[in-house]
């Protein structure tokens, strides 16, 4: 079963069942993606691979939606060519709100006209760099999925979910929502790394998300396992680590493995490629592939892999 991606450089053929890959010639920085083969209905991907995208991570590419689509697909295709079986789905963690210094959250889109609930701790600003409606439409058209992420501060997470779903829930690319817990009641936490997410709160968020679509997923992200729900588990819930600042790949893997061990019975995911780790990953041949292969080999419950936007223009995903 093949996923065929056509570009100006030629055809790129990625096969997930048999690890075969036809490499294109490199050199065309503005590659164009014409078609993405869809995963057959009823079959769930083995892995989700792509990019983190925020308005502040790589601002010079804020309006270049096709650029993000192409690289998410290329990264997923590259991983598909390195695994033994299954499908690899291109996915973008799409961040629509940012933590505010006053402890609240800034939404990068207009409040939906039909929304009448709480807006405590929220500011709505449409001029923040990314046209989220346009970006999500580009994902829809090209077979790239998205999870909407919040940096909620002290705003109500249930309200965050409802507002975003009213604004963007019509997009077929969306498969769920996520929260960066480092920015969850950050100002109220002693070390300003966010308050721990309580089991009962995670359960409420999960139930809210599933009320919109029973197939939707929820991720909770942090670098410190102590900030995660202690006992709450759900098949549609997964935990995402954005840990960074390591001296080498082995140290990163020790931390990532510890994260997985702490999240017993749950699927896990990882963000990597941070500038703070560039000293060692930049010395690798094909850093996205090398790091991903190590994660998948060492951590069986790792299903979600993302290169961060901060350095997404400094590596090749082919």
Pin down the residues of each PLM region.
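Substrate-binding cleft of secreted/luminal carbohydrate-active enzymes
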Residues: 244-318
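Active-site cleft segment of glycoside hydrolase catalytic domains centered on the general acid/base Glu
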Residues: 159-163, 167-171, 178-214
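Hydrophobic faces of well-ordered beta-strands that scaffold small-molecule active sites
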Residues: 45-51, 90-94, 146-150, 175-179, ...
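Substrate-binding cleft/loops of secretory-pathway carbohydrate-active enzymes
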Residues: 155, 159-166, 224-252
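An active-site-proximal structural segment forming one wall of the substrate-binding cleft
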Residues: 127-141, 153-176
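Catalytic domains of carbohydrate-active enzymes, especially glycoside hydrolases
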Residues: 34-102
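Aromatic-lined substrate-binding rim segments of carbohydrate-active enzymes
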Residues: 100-151, 201, 205-216
């Amino acid at each position: 079963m093949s996923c065929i991606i056509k570009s100006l450089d030629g055809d790129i053929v990625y096969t997930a069942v048999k690890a075969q890959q036809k490499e294109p010639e490199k050199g065309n920085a503005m590659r164009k993606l014409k078609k993405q083969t869809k995963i057959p209905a009823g079959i769930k991907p083995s892995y989700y691979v792509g990019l983190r995208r925020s308005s502040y991570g790589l601002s010079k590419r804020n309006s270049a939606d096709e650029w993000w689509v192409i690289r998410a697909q290329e990264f997923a295709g590259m991983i598909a060519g390195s695994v033994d079986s299954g499908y690899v789905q291109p996915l973008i963690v799409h961040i629509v709100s940012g933590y505010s210094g006053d402890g609240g959250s800034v939404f990068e889109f207009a409040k939906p006209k039909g929304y009448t609930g709480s807006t405590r701790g929220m500011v709505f600003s449409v001029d923040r760099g990314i046209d989220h409606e346009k970006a999500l439409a580009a994902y829809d058209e090209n077979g790239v999925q998205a999870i909407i992420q919040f940096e909620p501060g002290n705003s109500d997470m249930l309200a965050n979910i409802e507002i975003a779903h009213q604004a963007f829930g019509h997009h077929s690319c969306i498969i769920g929502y996520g929260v960066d817990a480092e920015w969850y009641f950050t100002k109220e936490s002693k070390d300003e790394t966010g308050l721990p997410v309580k089991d009962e709160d995670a359960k409420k968020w999960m139930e809210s998300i599933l009320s919109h679509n029973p197939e939707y997923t929820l991720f909770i992200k942090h670098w410190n396992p102590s900030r995660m729900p202690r006992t709450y588990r759900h098949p549609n819930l997964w935990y995402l680590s954005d840990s960074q600042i390591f001296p080498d790949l082995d140290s990163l893997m020790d931390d990532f493995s510890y994260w997985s061990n702490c999240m017993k019975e749950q699927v896990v995911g990882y963000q990597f490629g941070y500038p703070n780790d560039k000293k060692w990953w930049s010395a690798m041949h094909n850093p996205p592939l090398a790091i991903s292969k190590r994660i998948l080999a060492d951590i069986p419950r790792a299903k979600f892999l993302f290169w961060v936007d901060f350095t997404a223009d400094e590596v090749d995903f082919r």
